[in-house]
Amino acid sequence: MEEFQRYIELDRSWQHNFFYPLIFQEYIYGFAYDHGLNKSILLENAGDKKYSLLIVKRLITRMYQQNHLILSDKNSNQNDFFGHKHKKNLYYQMISEGFAVIVEIPFSLLLISSLEAKEKKIVKSNNLRSIHSIFPFFEDKFLHLNYALEILIPYPIHLEILVQTLRYWVKDASSLHLLRFFLYEYRNCNSLITPPKSISIFSKSNQRLFLFLYNFHVCEYESLFVFLCNQSSHLRSISFGALLERIYFYGKLEYLVKVKTFTKYLRVILWFFKDPFLHYVRYRGKSILTSKGTSFLMHKWKYYLINFWQSRFSLWSQPRRIYINPLSKHSLDFMGFFSSVRLNSSVVRSQMVENSFLIDNPIKKFDTIVRIIPLVGSLAKAKFCNVLGHPISKSVWTDLLDSDIIDRFGRICRNLSHYYSGSSRKKSLYQIKYILRLSCARTLARKHKSTVRAFLKRLGSEFLEEFFTEEERILSLILPRDSSISRRFYRGPIWYLDIFCIHDLVNDE
C-alpha cells in the first residue's frame, strides 16, 4: 500500500478527487492483478496466459462506441447472438473489476490518512475493530434497555441512487458518467439473456463493485442518521427555526415545506424522539436500534426511519421490514446468535427476630445461543451431513493425504469453536463438533475402504483429539485451573476480539 500510495501522490488528479484519469493508469490494473483479483478476467489470451494491462482501457473505449455495444438479432442466428451476448457479459465483468479497484483504493487511502491523524489524539485499540466487540457491548447495555428495532436495510431499487450517493465525494463528472453508463448498459445486457425475476445487480460475478457501492450508500445513510440521533438529545432546547436551519442541507426542500405547515405541533412530535439511551449497531444489511423508551416511542422511530429513507434517499421500505420487539420476551437474531435477556431468580432467606421469610430477587442476564438449524443447513450444503444432521463422508476429499483431511476438518472445527465461544449454552456447539468429527472419520474410512468402527479400532479415537481443541484447554495455558478467575472464565462466555468478519466457516476449502 505504501508503494501504491506513492503513485497516487504523483498523480495530481486524485488530489482533486478526479477518478477518470486513474482509469487509464496501468499501475492500477497491475496492482489489482498482484493482489488476488480474478486473474483470468484480465488475460488477453487465456491460452498462453499473457497478461495485458491495456484490455480494460480498450473495453472502456469500446463501450462508448454504440456500434459495438448495440446488438441486434437481425441477420444473425440464435447461437451467434447468445455467444456475442455472453462475450459482452465477460467484457462488463472485466470493467467492473477494474473500476472496483479504482474506487476502493483512493477511499482506503483517505481512511488510512484519517486514522493516522486520529492516532495522535486517541489511543489505538485494534480490539474495537472486531465484530465480536458488539457482544460485550450488548452484555453491558441490554440489561438496562426495554425495546429493540430489528431493521432490514432496504436495497436501492434504482441504480441512479448509487451514482447520486457518490456524487458528493467524486468531483469529476466523467467518472460518474462512465459509472452510470456502465451500470445501465450492464443491466440492459443482462435483461436480454436473463429472466427479469432473476436479475440482481449484486450478483456474484460483479459482487466487488456493487458491494462497495452498497456499503458506501449505507455509510452515507448512517452518517446522517447518527447526526440526527445526536441532535435528538437536545431537541427540547432548540427552537423550530434553529433546528430547521441545522438539518436544511440534509433534507429535500419540498419535504421541509410540508413539515413547516405543522410548526405548532413540531415541538410535541420532536419531544417524543428525545431518548438519551439510544444505541445502534449494524452488520451487513441488518441493524438493531435499542432504547429504554416505551413501545410508543419505538413506533415513532420506526415510521421516522421509513420517512427518512423515502424523503432523503428515495428508498421505499415496507413497515414489516422493521420489527419492534421487547427485549424481555424476544431473542434477537444477529450474526449467527440468538441474543436475549433472561431473568434468573435468586432466592435469599432473611431472618428478622423470630420470623424468617424468603426474598425472590430476579437478576437479568444476557444470554447467547448458537443458531443450530442454519448451521446444520450450511454443513449439509457443504456435504458434511444430510439435511437431518446425520454425518456423511466428504467424498471430494478422499484423494487427499490423511494429514490434509484431518487438517481441513480440524481447521473448520477450530474456526467454529473460536467464533461461537461466546455462546452461553455449549450443547449446540458440541452437536456441530460431533457432526464434523464423525464426518472426518467416515471420510478417512471411505478412503481406506473400511468401516468407521474398524478404522477407529485400528488407529484409536485419540488421533482426532489433536485438532478438536476445546476452548478450556486453550485457557488452561493462560490461567491456572484452580484459580477463582479461571473458574469464572470456564463457566461464562468468551469473546475473542481478533475476528474481523464472518467467514464462510463451513465451506473452508
Curated annotation (Swiss-Prot):
It is found in: Plastid, Chloroplast. The keyword Plastid applies. InterPro entries: Domain_X, Maturase_MatK, Maturase_MatK_N. GO terms for molecular function: RNA binding. Keywords: Chloroplast, mRNA processing, Plastid, RNA-binding, tRNA processing. GO terms for biological process: mRNA processing; RNA splicing; tRNA processing. GO terms for cellular component: chloroplast. Belongs to the intron maturase 2 family. MatK subfamily. Usually encoded in the trnK tRNA gene intron. Probably assists in splicing its own and other chloroplast group II introns. PANTHER family: MATURASE K. This is Maturase K. The gene is matK.
